[in-house]
Amino acid sequence: MSPESFDHRFGGTRRLYGQHAVEKLRNAHIAVIGIGGVGSWAAEALARTAVGTITLIDLDDICVTNTNRQLHATADTIGQAKVDVMAERLQAINPECTVHRIDDFITPDNIPDLITQQFDYVIDAIDNFRVKASLIAHCHYNKIKVITTGGAGGQMDPTQIQVTDLTKTWHDPLARKVRNQLRDQHGLNKNTKRKFGVDCVFSAEQSVYPQPDGSVCQQKPAGGGSQKMDCTSGFGASTMVTATFGFVAVARVVKKLTQ
């Protein structure tokens, strides 16, 4: 892409952040882990903000039940790999962007091989608290910048989404489990008054739970059940919330990279 073409495509970004900041973004390499309700929107925002290299990591295929919250889910993409559909979209947005596809799930075993210091930032959009904790601990101990996202399910009000240190979230069971795991299993700051130094996007909204009779309320159903945001059960979800989680994460990453 010629300098003129790049400036036409991202002139609005330059006029907002400045030329020096845009060059930093153009030279940045950012990983998005989990290309779902949060990660798909985060990847989109990165591409539309002139980030030069993006690595997408996820093993899932697109399911029809992803339609309510995931950017890549359309009638034409059902059954295709999320990383493939998303990579094609990102390169259509910015043909200069290099997009690496890793069609795999992150696990505690493969984190050291997949997450290295080649990344200027890692965006964690995983929904498994043990894997999230392993990823954050790896980044912490290897001085790789990471931002994590809390639970986006069961919430309706995107105006309550904010960023704080992972130790300071509230009304977020996923973030609570992650920080407990970090302290108990990974040795991060067992002093509860000390911060982790890891940004977390979360919502201060109280989650609502689906009830057996088809209603929703802030009380957990009597029979228990899943509290995950998955395809067939557990929390419901809204694009307005999951997308905002992704956008807020990218806004923080861009701010940190261009300061």
Go through each PLM region and give its residues.
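N-terminal charged helix/coil linker that caps or initiates catalytic domains
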Residues: 1-31
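Glycine-rich phosphate/adenylate-binding loop
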Residues: 2-6, 117-121, 126, 131, ...
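Conserved N-terminal Rossmann-fold NAD(P)-binding element of oxidoreductases
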Residues: 32-34, 57
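Hydrophobic/small residue at the entry helix of a nucleotide-binding pocket
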Residues: 38-39
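Glycine-rich phosphate-binding loop and adjoining beta1-alpha1-beta2 segment
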Residues: 51-94
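Conserved acidic residues
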Residues: 104-105
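Short amphipathic alpha-helix with an adjacent loop that forms part of the alpha/beta core around
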Residues: 109-118
